[in-house]
C-alpha cells in the first residue's frame, strides 16, 4: 500500500475497497469495453443535445417563464454531460482515477450539483404551474421572466450549498493493486476519537440528506402540485393536459427512474458500514446506478421531442423543417415576415427540437448557412405558435 493510503484515516468500508484487486476475467473485460463505448456515446450525445437546446431556447426563441425553466434545466444537464467524458476516461484506464485529487473533487461535485439543481428546478416548474392555475390573478401580476431567473439563481445557490459537503469529503485513495479511487472519505475532516461511529453517522447523514432534499421532497412537491392543478382543472371541465404538461410529466418520470435506484443504493451503502454483508451488493450495483443517473442528462433533450403528438409520423419532415427554418438568412426572415407569420405553420414554430409538435411547412429553397451563422444570437427573438404553446402551461 502506498504512503498516501497509509497516512490517511479511512473508514472500514473504504479500507476494504482499497484491498480489492483488479479483475482479469475476459467476459468482465468485454463488459468494461462496452461500458466505455456506451459512456463515450452518451457523453457525445449529451453535449450535442443540450448544447442545441441551450442555443435554440436561449437565442432563437422569445423568452418566457417556461423557456427560462427549460434553459436552466438544459444548463444543468450540459454540465453533467460535460463531466461524463472524464468518467469515461476513468473506465477506460481500468477504473483508476488518474486526474488528481482536485479534479476528483470538481468532477464529483458537478454530479451532485446536477442532482440537486434538477430536483429543485423540477419542483419550481411544478409550483409555477400550480400558481398559474390556482392563483391566476397573482401569477398574472408577478410571473415574469426576470422573476423566474431570480428564482433559478436562488435554486442554483441552494444546489451549490448542498454540494459543498461532497466536495469537502471527496478524495483520492490508492489501492493495493496500484489503481486510484475517487471516492468519499468522510474522515478527512475532524475524524474524532471513535472513527467507526464517525464513519457511520456522516455516511448516513449524507445519504439521507441527499435522498430527502434532491429526491423525496421534490417528488412530493411535484405530486402535490399536480394534484392541486388536476382538481382545479376538473372544476373547470378541462381534462386533456397541454403539451408542456406532458413534457414536464415525462421529464419528472425520467428523473424518478434514473435517480431513484441511485438513492436506494446510496442508502444501502450507508447501511453497509454497520452491515458488511451488504458491501458486495453495493460495490456491484452502485457503478451501474451512477451511470443511470448520468444518463438522465442525455434523456431529457430527447423527451423534449418525444412528448410531442404524432412524433413518429412527423419526425422525418419535422427535422427537415427545423434545419431549413434555422439555417435561413435573417434578412429573409425580415423580408417575408409579414406573409409567413400569417401561416399556421411558421418557421418560429420549428425553431427548436420541440417543434415536432407543429405541422412542418414545405421547404423554401436552399438553406442559407452563412447568413444564419452571421445572425447567430443577435437575431431578433422569434415569436409564434410554439412559444405561445410553451407559455400556456395550463392549457
From Swiss-Prot:
It is found in: Cell membrane. Changing residue 331 to A: 45% increases internalization of PTGDR2. Widespread expression. High expression in stomach, small intestine, heart and thymus. Intermediate expression in colon, spinal cord and peripheral blood and low expression in brain, skeletal muscle and spleen. Expressed also on Th2- and Tc2- type cells, eosinophils and basophils. Disulfide bonds join 104-182. Residues 57-67, 128-146, 232-247, 309-395 are cytoplasmic. InterPro entries: Formyl_rcpt-rel (IPR000826), GPCR_Rhodpsn (IPR000276), GPCR_Rhodpsn_7TM (IPR017452). GO terms for cellular component: neuron projection; plasma membrane. Keywords: Cell membrane, Disulfide bond, G-protein coupled receptor, Glycoprotein, Membrane, Phosphoprotein, Receptor, Transducer, Transmembrane, Transmembrane helix. PROSITE patterns: G_PROTEIN_RECEP_F1_1 (PS00237), G_PROTEIN_RECEP_F1_2 (PS50262). Changing residue 332 to A: 45% increases internalization of PTGDR2. Phosphorylated. It is a multi-pass membrane protein. Residues 1-33, 90-106, 169-210, 270-288 are extracellular. The 330-DSEL-333 motif is involved in the recycling of PTGDR2 to the cell surface after agonist-induced internalization. This motif seems to be required for GRK2 and GPRK5/GRK5 to promote agonist-induced internalization. Thr-347 is a major site for PKC-induced internalization of the receptor. Receptor for prostaglandin D2 (PGD2). Coupled to the G(i)-protein. Receptor activation may result in pertussis toxin-sensitive decreases in cAMP levels and Ca(2+) mobilization. PI3K signaling is also implicated in mediating PTGDR2 effects. PGD2 induced receptor internalization. CRTH2 internalization can be regulated by diverse kinases such as, PKC, PKA, GRK2, GPRK5/GRK5 and GRK6. Receptor activation is responsible, at least in part, in immune regulation and allergic/inflammation responses. This is Prostaglandin D2 receptor 2. It comes from Homo sapiens.
Amino acid at each position: 500500500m502506498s504512503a498516501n493510503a497509509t497516512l490517511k484515516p479511512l473508514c472500514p468500508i473504504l479500507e476494504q475497497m482499497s484491498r480489492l484487486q483488479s479483475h482479469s476475467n475476459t467476459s468482465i473485460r468485454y463488459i468494461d469495453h462496452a461500458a466505455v463505448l456506451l459512456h463515450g456515446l452518451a457523453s457525445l450525445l449529451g453535449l450535442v443535445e443540450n448544447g442545441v437546446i441551450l442555443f435554440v431556447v436561449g437565442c432563437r426563441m422569445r423568452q418566457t417563464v417556461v423557456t427560462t425553466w427549460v434553459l436552466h434545466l438544459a444548463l444543468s444537464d450540459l454540465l453533467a454531460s460535460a463531466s461524463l467524458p472524464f468518467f469515461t476516461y476513468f473506465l477506460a484506464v481500468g477504473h483508476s482515477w488518474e486526474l488528481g485529487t482536485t479534479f476528483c473533487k470538481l468532477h464529483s461535485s458537478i454530479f451532485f450539483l446536477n442532482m440537486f439543481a434538477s430536483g429543485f428546478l423540477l419542483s419550481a416548474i411544478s409550483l409555477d404551474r400550480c400558481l398559474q392555475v390556482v392563483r391566476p390573478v397573482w401569477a398574472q401580476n408577478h410571473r415574469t421572466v426576470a422573476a423566474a431567473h431570480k428564482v433559478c439563481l436562488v435554486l442554483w445557490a441552494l444546489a451549490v450549498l448542498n454540494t459543498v459537503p461532497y466536495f469537502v469529503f471527496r478524495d483520492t485513495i490508492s489501492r493495493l493493486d496500484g489503481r486510484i479511487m475517487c471516492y468519499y472519505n468522510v474522515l478527512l475532516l475532524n475524524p474524532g476519537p471513535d472513527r467507526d461511529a464517525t464513519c457511520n453517522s456522516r455516511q448516513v447523514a449524507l445519504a439521507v440528506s441527499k435522498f430527502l432534499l434532491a429526491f423525496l421532497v421534490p417528488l412530493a412537491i411535484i405530486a402535490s402540485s399536480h394534484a392541486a392543478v388536476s382538481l382545479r382543472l376538473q372544476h373547470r371541465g378541462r381534462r386533456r393536459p397541454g403539451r408542456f404538461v406532458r413534457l414536464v410529466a415525462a421529464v419528472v418520470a425520467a428523473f424518478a427512474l434514473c435517480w431513484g435506484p441511485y438513492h436506494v443504493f446510496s442508502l444501502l451503502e450507508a447501511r453497509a458500514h454497520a452491515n458488511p454483508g451488504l458491501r458486495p451488493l453495493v460495490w456491484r450495483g452502485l457503478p451501474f446506478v451512477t451511470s443511470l443517473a448520468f444518463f438522465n442528462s442525455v434523456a431529457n433533450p430527447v423527451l423534449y421531442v418525444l412528448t410531442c403528438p404524432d412524433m413518429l409520423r412527423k419526425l422525418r419532415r419535422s427535422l427537415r423543417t427545423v434545419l431549413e427554418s434555422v439555417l435561413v438568412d435573417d434578412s429573409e426572415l425580415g423580408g417575408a415576415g409579414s406573409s409567413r407569420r400569417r401561416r399556421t405553420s411558421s418557421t418560429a414554430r420549428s425553431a427548436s427540437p420541440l417543434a415536432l409538435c407543429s405541422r412542418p411547412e414545405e421547404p423554401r429553397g436552399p438553406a442559407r448557412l452563412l447568413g444564419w451563422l452571421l445572425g447567430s444570437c443577435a437575431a431578433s427573438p422569434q415569436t409564434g405558435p410554439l412559444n405561445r404553446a410553451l407559455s400556456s402551461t395550463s392549457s
